[in-house]
Each structure stands twice: as structure tokens, then as C-alpha cells.
């Protein structure tokens, strides 16, 4: 026992020593009032130092906490709505694929065919399956578009419309009534269209792959105009929603102006902007001409039923019609009158009569000013277009010209102007043909005069060529410059006149047998002897040397006319044109003559012996 230390026995315990326990409790009692006193004094100091009571701070903290709770609650509600929309989308997808929810519930209970472990599991199964059986009849009776509008799910509504865009008649009956189920229809519609208007004009063409997506947005805007029932008030739109829609309309117009103006916009593009301002209001920077261009380019006859219900656009139509008439756009103004159903305010007969009077006066002025058939034709064509547009407008709206426009005889005027136009075309064609003949004659005369003034060789100077065509290539396929340094194209030209190459030696012109000595005081150089020979009269191989009597053209610096001896019997005289080709230039003869005068001994080797 001595090996173990007395640890447990040596330590005093509170149960074994009651005096020690009493001492500790008394000590705690003494210390407790001190702590309370310090805390109270610190609270007194803080309250004394602060300007407001402590309970006001507590109220502020509670207010901040309530704001945080409200924010959390709002986010939680949004999340819950999003989850519900996902569940509804899944259910609708299953229904479209032919899957019945009851069958799905049966499959859900299929694993429970095994005996349950206890009664609790059975009760849990019943409570889980019961709500699903109650929801099925509610979702099955409500249309898909209505559920999406009730849930304010813009993406779900767009997907539903996109999937059924081919059946627009059904959608136009379903979507306007479905929008009434939305809590805030104006905000919901603005969220549905998004910011597709910022895309370029190519996205609004019929060939664009995004054309169907653009049609979805236009259908939602048109449905929003058709949503309220007739005579039951107007749709309430918040001010901030109007401001957001106005910003979108201004950005849309700005893009169209940069792409060529509203008058050059695509049909779908113009229709979208027109429906947007008809739904949410016309911005202040929109002019009457802008609205007129949008109505003209959008095919407003197709959406006339929706435009007539616009609380923002209909009051402005009267001013737009009047301004259009003042600008001479009577036909466009009349189309707008019929689009918005304002026939009681603007008479078609008065509008068309004013238009015909104005066009007739303009046509008479143009005829008086016309100084040529072309100007008269332009005036007649313009008047014909005016009358044709009037007839087309009356046929479109089923108006009788005899009743609405008595005394004008529009059809007879159209026939007369067409005849005048055809007659003018014939006269202008005949005049153009005569002018072309005169121009051709003048051109031929000018070319003939130029040919006369151009120097040419006479037939005696330039006889016909023996060969079919001139070619400086010899029989051995070599060019003159390749055979000898002194031979050139002139030698080939001479050979074409003198005959075949078998009778004419193509050798160096400096060969001794071709050189003829000149008289004393001549040019100081030899002249080739074959210049005046017949084709078959010379052959160096036979040993004949025929000399040419040459009279120097320059003797002691004086120029004399060239003298040629008559041809020898059996020889052909070389034409004078070829002789001129081989004649030396005057500058060269002058140079050679001066050299002979200064050094008479330089040509002593050429003197005849």
C-alpha cells in the first residue's frame, strides 16, 4: 500500500467538509452585490450619456429586424412561385405527352404494396398522396396560358405561345382572357416582350430564324389591347411601368432612324413599335409623321381591331389625319380613317375630291411648262398614278365612283392618259432612232476624212505580198536577230516580197558578194546589191555579181536626187517603197558627207579600180 500515493484520500471534498462549503457560499454572496452594482452603474452611465431612452433604440432594432424579415419573406415568396411554376410546367409537359397524373400516383404507391412496418408509415402515405389527388382536377381544367399568366411566369407563357404559334386564331381567343388572371397585366406584358427591339432589322424579316420569336411578342402586345371588355373601363397602368415602356419605345425609334428611318422599316418591326405605343402611351418626342409612317408600314388593316381599343393612340388619330391632308397625303389619311373607324368625322368623298383637284392643277402646270416630249410624259405618268391610286382606294373600301365622285370620270381619264403615254413612247423611239442614224453617218464621215489624211503607199510602191502573212521567222525557226547581228525584220520583209528563201540567200549583208562599191565621194559605205533584183535572178552560188549603178546623193556636202539605173533584162525592178525603206536618213548622209570632205582618203578603198 505504501507504493501508491494517497491522491484521493488526501483531497478534501465539499461533502466531507461542511465548513468549507459554508465558507464558499458566503464568499459568493459577498461577491454578487459587487457585480450587480458595477452593472447598474455602467447602465446608468450609458443612459446618462445617450440622448434618447433605451426603449427607442429597441424599437429601431425591431424595425430593422422587421425590414429584414419582410425582405426574406418576399424572396421566399418569389422562390415558392418559381418552384410552383416549374411544377406546373412539368405537369403540363407530362399531360401533353399523354402521361396521366393518376397513373403517376399509382406508380408512386406501387412500392407500398409490401406490408408496412407500423401504422405510422401508412398514415404518412395517406397524407402525402391525398394533396396530389386534390390538385389534379384543378390543373387539368385550367388552360396552360391561363396558368402561366396567373403565376406571372413570362418565360412559360412565351414557350406556350411559341409552341402553338401556327394556330394564331386559337391563341387570339385564349391569351386576352388569360392575361386577366395576372396580378399586374401591364408589368407582365412588358416582361414578356423583353428587349427584343434592340436587335437589328434583319431579325424582323420573314427569312430570319427568330421571326417566330418576334411574332410571340407582337401577339402578346395585341392581346393586351384586346384584354379589356368593351365598355368596362380601361386597364390601370402604373406610372413607373409607363416610364419603362416609354424608354423602350424611344430606344426602338432611335434604332429604326439609324437604319434608314421609320418609312423604310420592316413590317414586323414597325408593327411592334406601333403596338407598344398603343399599349403604354406615345412618347413626347414622337411626331405625327412618325406615327403615320408606322401605320403605313405596319399593315395596320390586319391589327385594326386592336388599334381601335388603344386609349393612347385613338385620340391622336384626328390630328394625324389633318396633318396628312395638309401635306398632300390624302390617300394615306383616308386609309387611317378607315383603320380607326372614323368615317363619321372625315368624309371619303371630300378627301378624294380635294386630292383630285390638287393633282389636276399640278398636272396643268406641268403641261404648260413642258418643253419636250419627255417632260410631258413625266407629267402624264404622275397624273396617271394619282388616278390609279384613287381607283384602288375606292375598290378596297367598296366605294362607288359615280356616287362619291360625280363628274370626274376617272376611268375615262385613265384610258386617255394611257393612250397619250403610248403615243409619246413611239415618238420618242422614232426620234432616238433618227438621232442614232445621224450620229452613225457623222461618225462614218469623220473616219473617212481621217483615212484620206493618213499617208499611204501607192499600189505601185507596195505590191501585194507573195506570202499569206508576214513573219520574221526563217525556215529553220530562228529569228533574224538569232542568225546574225546585222539582220533584222526588214530582211524578212524584203524576202516576203522577193520570193521563197531557196532563191534568196539569208546571209550576212556584209558578205563580199553582196557588197557593191560606190563611186568616189559617195556615202562612204557599201549598198546591198539584192535590193533591186528579181527573186530568181540572183544566186551567189552561180558566181554572178550584178552591180547596181548608184548615184551618190551627197557629193562633197551637196545633196543630189537619187538616180537609179533601169533594171537589167530578166530582172524585176524593186518597188520604190522598199527602196525608201533602205534609204539612209538625211542626218546620216550629212554626217557621212562631211567626213568624206574632211578626209577624202578615208574612202579610197571603196573607189573602183
UniProtKB/Swiss-Prot annotation:
Coiled coil (UniProt feature): 60-97, 409-440
Name the domain of life this protein comes from.
Answer: Eukaryota
Q: Where is the composition biased (Polar residues)?
A: 594-609
* Start and end residues of each stretch annotated as Disordered: 1-31, 454-488, 587-609
What Gene Ontology cellular-component terms does the record carry? nuclear speck
On induction, the UniProt comment says:
Not regulated by vernalization.
Protein location: Nucleus speckle
Low complexity: compositionally biased ranges = 1-18
Q: Which InterPro entries match?
A: Frigida
What outcome is documented for mutating residue 79 to I in this protein?
In strain: cv. SF-2
Q: What is its main location?
A: nucleus
Biological process terms from the Gene Ontology for this record are: cell differentiation; flower development
> Which Pfam families does UniProt cross-reference here?
Frigida
Query: Known PANTHER family for this protein?
Result: FRIGIDA-LIKE PROTEIN 3-RELATED, INACTIVE PROTEIN FRIGIDA
Protein role? Required for the regulation of flowering time in the late-flowering phenotype. Involved in the enrichment of a WDR5A-containing COMPASS-like complex at the 'FLOWERING LOCUS C' that trimethylates histone H3 'Lys-4', leading to FLC up-regulation and RNA levels increase. Variants with an early-flowering phenotype (Including cv. Columbia, cv. Landsberg Erecta and cv. Wassilewskija) show loss-of-function mutations of FRI. Able to delay flowering independently of FRL1 activity.
Q: Outline the subunit composition.
A: Homodimer. Component of the transcription activator complex FRI-C composed of FRI, FRL1, SUF4, FLX and FES1. Interacts (via N-terminus) with FRL1 and (via C-terminus) with FLX (via N-terminus), SUF4 (via C-terminus) and FES1 (via C-terminus). Interacts with ASHH2 and RIN1, a component of the SWR1 chromatin-remodeling complex. Interacts with CBP20, FIP1 and FIP2.
Would you identify the family this protein belongs to, as annotated?
Belongs to the Frigida family.
Q: What is this protein called?
A: Protein FRIGIDA
Amino acid at each position: 500500500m505504501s507504493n501508491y500515493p494517497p491522491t484521493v484520500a488526501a483531497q478534501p471534498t465539499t461533502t466531507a467538509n461542511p465548513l468549507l462549503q459554508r465558507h464558499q457560499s458566503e464568499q459568493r454572496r459577498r461577491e454578487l452585490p459587487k457585480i450587480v452594482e458595477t452593472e447598474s452603474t455602467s447602465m446608468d452611465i450609458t443612459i446618462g450619456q445617450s440622448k434618447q431612452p433605451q426603449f427607442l433604440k429597441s424599437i429601431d432594432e425591431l424595425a430593422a429586424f422587421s425590414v429584414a424579415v419582410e425582405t426574406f419573406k418576399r424572396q421566399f415568396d418569389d422562390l415558392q412561385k418559381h418552384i410552383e411554376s416549374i411544377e406546373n410546367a412539368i405537369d403540363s409537359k407530362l399531360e401533353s405527352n399523354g402521361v396521366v397524373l393518376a397513373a403517376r400516383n399509382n406508380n408512386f404507391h406501387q412500392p407500398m404494396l409490401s406490408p408496412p412496418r407500423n401504422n405510422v408509415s401508412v398514415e404518412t402515405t395517406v397524407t402525402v398522396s391525398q394533396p396530389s389527388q386534390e390538385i389534379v382536377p384543378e390543373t387539368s381544367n385550367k388552360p396552360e396560358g391561363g396558368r402561366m399568366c396567373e403565376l406571372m411566369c413570362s418565360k412559360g407563357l412565351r414557350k406556350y405561345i411559341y409552341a402553338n404559334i401556327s394556330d394564331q386564331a386559337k391563341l387570339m381567343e385564349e391569351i386576352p382572357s388569360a392575361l386577366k388572371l395576372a396580378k399586374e397585366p401591364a408589368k407582365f406584358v412588358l416582361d414578356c416582350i423583353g428587349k427584343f427591339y434592340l436587335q437589328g432589322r434583319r431579325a424582323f424579316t420573314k427569312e430570319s430564324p427568330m421571326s417566330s420569336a418576334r411574332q410571340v411578342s407582337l401577339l402578346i402586345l395585341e392581346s393586351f389591347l384586346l384584354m379589356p371588355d368593351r365598355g368596362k373601363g380601361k386597364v390601370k397602368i402604373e406610372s413607373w411601368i409607363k416610364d419603362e415602356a416609354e424608354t423602350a419605345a424611344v430606344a426602338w425609334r432611335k434604332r429604326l432612324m439609324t437604319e434608314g428611318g421609320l418609312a423604310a422599316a420592316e413590317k414586323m418591326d414597325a408593327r411592334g413599335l406601333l403596338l407598344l405605343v398603343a399599349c403604354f402611351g406615345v412618347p413626347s418626342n414622337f411626331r405625327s409623321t412618325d406615327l403615320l409612317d408606322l401605320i403605313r408600314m405596319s399593315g395596320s388593316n390586319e391589327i385594326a381591331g386592336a388599334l381601335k381599343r388603344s386609349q393612347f393612340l385613338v385620340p391622336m388619330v384626328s390630328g394625324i389625319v389633318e396633318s396628312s391632308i395638309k401635306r398632300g397625303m390624302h390617300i394615306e389619311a383616308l386609309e387611317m380613317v378607315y383603320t380607326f373607324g372614323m368615317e363619321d368625322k372625315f368624309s371619303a368623298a371630300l378627301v378624294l375630291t380635294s386630292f383630285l383637284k390638287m393633282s389636276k392643277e399640278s398636272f396643268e402646270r406641268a403641261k404648260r411648262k413642258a418643253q419636250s416630249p419627255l417632260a410631258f410624259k413625266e407629267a402624264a405618268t404622275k397624273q396617271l398614278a394619282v388616278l390609279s391610286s384613287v381607283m384602288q382606294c375606292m375598290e378596297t373600301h367598296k366605294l362607288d365612283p359615280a356616287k362619291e365622285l360625280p363628274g370626274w370620270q376617272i376611268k375615262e381619264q385613265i384610258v386617255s392618259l394611257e393612250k397619250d403615254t403610248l403615243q409619246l413612247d413611239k415618238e420618242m423611239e422614232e426620234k432616238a432612232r433618227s438621232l442614232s442614224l445621224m450620229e452613225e453617218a457623222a461618225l462614218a464621215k469623220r473616219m473617212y476624212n481621217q483615212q484620206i489624211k493618213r499617208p499611204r503607199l501607192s499600189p505601185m510602191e507596195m505590191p501585194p505580198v507573195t506570202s499569206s502573212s508576214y513573219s520574221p521567222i526563217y525556215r529553220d525557226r530562228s529569228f533574224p536577230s538569232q542568225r546574225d547581228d546585222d539582220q533584222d525584220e526588214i530582211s524578212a520583209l524584203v524576202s516576203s516580197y522577193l520570193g521563197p528563201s531557196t532563191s534568196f540567200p539569208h546571209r550576212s549583208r556584209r558578205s563580199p558578194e553582196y557588197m557593191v562599191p560606190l563611186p568616189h565621194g559617195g556615202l562612204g559605205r557599201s549598198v546591198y546589191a539584192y535590193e533591186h533584183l528579181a527573186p530568181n535572178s540572183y544566186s551567189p552560188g552561180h558566181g554572178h555579181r550584178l552591180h547596181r549603178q548608184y548615184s551618190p546623193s551627197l557629193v562633197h556636202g551637196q545633196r543630189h536626187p537619187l538616180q537609179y539605173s533601169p533594171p537589167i533584162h530578166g530582172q524585176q525592178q524593186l518597188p520604190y517603197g522598199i527602196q525608201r525603206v533602205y534609204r539612209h536618213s538625211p542626218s546620216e548622209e550629212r554626217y557621212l558627207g562631211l567626213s568624206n570632205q574632211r578626209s577624202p582618203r578615208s574612202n579610197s578603198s571603196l573607189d573602183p579600180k
